[in-house]
């Protein structure tokens, strides 16, 4: 009976350890994916700001053309 308890305890302990390792790896993978998503969103934000800057520059240039006339 004591042997069965020890064996069961060992199996449960090893199962718990393997689950915690899998959870840790899963969290690391999710963190990497989130970091990649953050980098992509930063790139999009930078692109949007450049586009807006270009649009504003074009509007400003057009308004200066009309002022000179």
From Swiss-Prot:
Residues 30-40 have a biased composition (Acidic residues). Residues 25-45 are annotated as: Disordered. Residues 1-22 form the signal peptide. Thermostable. Its main location: secreted. Expressed by the skin glands. Keywords: Amphibian defense peptide, Amyloid, Antibiotic, Antimicrobial, Chemotaxis, Cleavage on pair of basic residues, Immunity, Innate immunity, Membrane, Secreted, Signal, Target cell membrane, Target membrane. One of its GO terms (biological process) is innate immune response. It holds the Pfam family FSAP_sig_propep. GO terms for cellular component: extracellular region; membrane; other organism cell membrane. InterPro entries: Frog_antimicrobial_propeptide. Residues 23-45 form a propeptide. It is found in: Secreted; Target cell membrane. Monomer and/or weakly self-associated, oligomer, and amyloid-like fibril. Can adopt a monomeric nonamphipathic alpha-helical conformation, possibly with the aid of its cationic N- and C-termini, when bound to anionic membranes. Forms stable and ordered beta-sheet aggregates in aqueous environment or when bound to anionic or zwitterionic phospholipid vesicles. Belongs to the frog skin active peptide (FSAP) family. The mutant DRS S9r3 shows antiviral activity against HIV. Atypical cationic antimicrobial peptide with potent activity against Gram-negative and Gram-positive bacteria. Acts by inducing permeabilization of bacterial membrane. In vitro, also shows chemoattractant activity, which is mediated through a G protein-coupled receptor (probably FPR2 coupled to the ERK1/2 MAPK kinase pathway). Has slow-kinetic self-association and amyloid-like properties that modulate its activity. Has a highly hydrophobic core sequence flanked at either side by cationic termini. This is Atypical cationic antimicrobial peptide.
